[in-house]
A protein has these predicted regions:
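Alpha-helix boundary/N-cap detector
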Residues: 135-139, 192
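Acidic/polar-rich alpha-helix caps and helix-coil junctions
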Residues: 1-130, 151-435
Length: 435
């Protein structure tokens, strides 16, 4: 996959990066054949995995009471459990479980009512509690925006969002009604951006006013929730250990972890490196890129995207959906302002990229995907934004805030340098381009 991708396949940015014989380290002519071989390898890997029992994970496989869950929670739990359920049916290759204890502590929002800040034991106890659920791994506002609408298309393409003014007013607020009670706390005021999103949005992210299934409460009518404003339980209450963006990485926190004011139980799990959903998306991408011409997208590309989307609740008959939105052609034709996008190779390239960003969000793939696509110079040079987490009331909290302006990501940053000591040991080594 890496060899076929733009970074290493016909990348003329590195035309002058050559060996001692003057030959480019990176081939200068694009080869479609590399994508053909990648597609063949992905298909072989899929067949091997499925033959040996791998299948897309469904939380009903492990949660004895999942059949009683409302659809909103069931499908959001599918994406959470795909990552955190130990040795589940989708896992192909993982790292050891060591480290996921700390990962979960640093990702978990403090959803247990802590003692009020004060003097003596009250302050100490509250601080300890917050250290068990620090929430410092903070997804960005851009991450929140990249998830689809409930119609399975990008929010900046969704005709319902555009014509109603919802997209332009997505940073304004509205009150949660009982219609959204499984995703957000009824009566809470939160951003318009948080309404009418796909299940993976609610399964991957916690935010001010969002419900948090499990972790001590599984009664769907009395769920934990995030109280993320300044001075509140999930927010900046102690001056440390809080999300600087206002978002939390719910996806990587196992739902059976239990945190109270006096104790903590965290179930470690092997963190996925490659899972079947990832492999399906690799295959769809490779098959699309291997196709000659711009209007001959193979049917299998749509088939494998459908598998991933439908597992996530993007399908007819779920959450009141009347259209077959598992098929991106149907979703875009019905709901997008760019209805022909899935019919072209270039359009499908864009769709597959976003599908990977959504499906694999918070799993450590996006940085390297952006590198191999040669999109990092644009995407990783953007300002990091979030909500104003120093705000105590809605009017102050829901203000988009620039938290960090990174230096520009340039051509040299796609490849890392060889350290000076190694160059001194072997004088025939050639330093990486730009360093």
């Amino acid at each position: 996959l890496w060899a076929a991708s733009p970074l290493f396949n016909g990348n003329k940015d590195y035309a002058n990066f050559r060996n001692e014989e003057g030959k480019p380290f990176i081939n200068q002519e694009f080869s479609r054949e590399k994508w053909v071989r990648t597609a063949e390898a992905c298909k072989e890997a899929i067949e091997s995995a499925e033959t040996n029992g791998c299948q897309l994970y469904d939380c009903s496989m492990d949660m004895s009471y999942s059949q009683d869950l409302p659809e909103e929670i069931f499908y959001s739990m599918n994406i959470r459990q795909t990552v955190t359920e130990r040795f589940n049916s989708e896992l192909i290759w993982s790292v050891g479980k060591q480290g996921t204890n700390e990962l979960q502590n640093l990702s978990m929002a403090c959803i247990v009512p802590s003692l009020q800040q004060g003097s003596g034991n009250g302050q100490v106890t509250g601080s300890i509690l917050q250290s068990r659920a620090a929430g410092v791994y903070a997804p960005t506002l851009e991450t929140a925006e990249q998830f689809y609408s409930k119609n399975g298309v990008p929010i900046d393409e969704d005709k319902e969002w555009l014509t109603s003014g919802k997209y332009d007013n997505r940073y304004t607020t509205r009150q949660v009604t009982s219609a959204d009670k499984y995703n957000m706390r009824t009566g809470w005021t939160t951003a318009v951006l948080h309404f009418n999103r796909e299940p993976r949005f609610y399964g991957s992210l916690g935010f001010d006013g969002s419900t948090w299934y499990g972790n001590g409460r599984t009664d769907v009518n009395d769920l934990n929730y995030v109280d993320g404003k300044y001075g509140r339980n999930s927010g900046n209450k102690w001056g440390f250990n809080y999300s600087i963006t206002g978002y939390f990485a719910k996806k990587v926190v196992y739902y059976q972890n239990a945190i109270t004011q006096s104790s903590q139980v965290v179930y470690e799990y092997p963190f996925p490196i490659i899972r079947l959903g990832d492999l399906y998306l690799m295959y769809a991408e490779s098959l699309n890129e291997a196709t000659e011409g711009d209007n001959n997208v193979p049917e299998e590309v749509y088939t494998y995207l459908r598998k991933v989307r439908e597992r996530s609740g993007l399908k007819k008959g779920v959450l009141g959906q009347t259209e077959d939105i598992g098929d991106v052609r149907v979703a875009w034709e019905k709901y997008s302002n760019d209805p022909t996008k899935p019919k072209t190779k270039d359009g499908m390239r864009s769709i597959i990229k976003q599908e990977r960003k959504i499906e694999l969000a918070l799993e450590g793939h996006q940085y390297n995907d952006l590198r191999r696509w040669k999109d990092a110079s644009k995407e990783l040079s953007k300002s990091i934004k979030g909500w104003n987490v120093q705000g105590e009331i809605e009017e102050d909290f829901y203000k988009v805030t620039t938290l960090f302006v990174p230096r520009a990501f340039t051509t040299k940053d796609y490849l890392w340098p060889i350290k000076k000591q190694d160059l001194q040991v072997d004088d025939k080594l050639i330093q990486t381009y730009g360093w």
